[in-house]
Amino acid sequence: MIRPSQLTEAALTASKADECIVLLTETSEANLRWANSTLTTNGHTTTRSFSVISVMQGARGAVDGPSIGTVSGNGADLDEVYAVVAASEQAARQSGPAQDVAPLVEGSAEDDFDAPGATTEIGVFARLADELAAAFRDPGAGARQLLYGFAEHRVATTWLASSTGLRRRWVQPTGTVELNAKVADDLTRSAWAGAYTTDFTDLDFPAITAEVRRRLGWSQRQLELPAGRYETILPPSAVGDLMIYMALTMEGRTTHEGRTAFSAPGGDTRLGERLTNLPLTLYSDPAATGLRTSPFLATSASHDSASVFDNGVPTHRVDWLSDGTINALAYPRAAAQELGGQFTPPPDNLLLTGGSSATAAIEDLVARTDRGLLLTCLWYIREVEPTSLLLTGLTRDGVYLLEGGEVVGQVNNFRFNESPIDLLRRTREVGATQRTLCREWNEWFARTAMPPICVPDFNMSSVSQAS
């Protein structure tokens, strides 16, 4: 069998473009699913994606700049590789000049470039399966409880090769587990918890199970509340969903064009503006413990925060907010040069630190709340107005009423309307940062570490009948 590294070399050898970049990603994935407190399915798949980026100098005239063509396939064999290379060259000839041109990154081959792709197998869930079996045998306190959920482990190996001599390889493991518990006699009573892991060896599944059972216990008393502004504690998962939305809009070009909440009049930006008096730092870091990401940029398509010309550029820590101040925007190299910014790669993980109560657990925030709400997670989040980053969405799987520092019952779900930028400004207390799994974004953005936060006036704009 031809190794992935050999396929990338074959593509570069076949290329007739002036310059060429080849990306190949091989993904090994195992999954486990359960429902009604019974294991239902498991599976293992291996997939491959293969992209060729051809760069043609003056393809449509001598005065034109370089044009690019990107074509993807699955890299099944050499015939397909050659077909993708030819199609990429044809696409480049038919394209107009690229707007994000920068010199391709030079380099040499890493020692592990010829190594095969890393893999996973169904055995990664061995301990989890035993812990699930024990949880299935435990009916839970009070009414009988049913467990539903899904565990997934993906190991993606990426090879990046360029006509400049650059050869890079990266292995990205991603593991997630989501657990939903319901009361057998009333399936509208539901609780959720999730976790991120790289290899399932550090997963505390009994603690996850205990948490959803605790929340189901809180739902024994059902209450109705109207829409309004409530003091609200958001757990790390919900905070993560909101911070991801914010970070992904922190793009240099769109901000200079006046199209984001970080824009200022006259084509300027809000860089340097204090967003909150709390010493909060929101950052991405490829070397973050337990949340590591690729140390180099790899993308098969250009967009406002990344460019195919930047493939192979080293990534680095970026403080998007620094001690409460807007500190960075994402710029490809070409946009940075044009707009007077600094090359800044887009985030692939996200951490929020520096809270007012940096050692406080969510239980501590609850104990200090006279009357308010405790959320489980957010769902179906959509952007309403980009220049203020106003978002709308729904609460899900448990909203709990707090009185006198204790949970006294479960209330109805709500639709909310909030901007994460404005939320940070109004946040009263921030607890300890911990690794978490967001609910809405976890399929695309799983690596986050967030604190719980307390907002004195979270806008529950209407009651939701969803359950």
Annotate each PLM feature.
Residues 1-307, 322-323, 404-406, 443, ...:
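Active-site bordering "gate/hinge" segments
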Residues 249, 267-467:
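Dual-mode signal for accessory low-complexity, basic/Gly-rich regions
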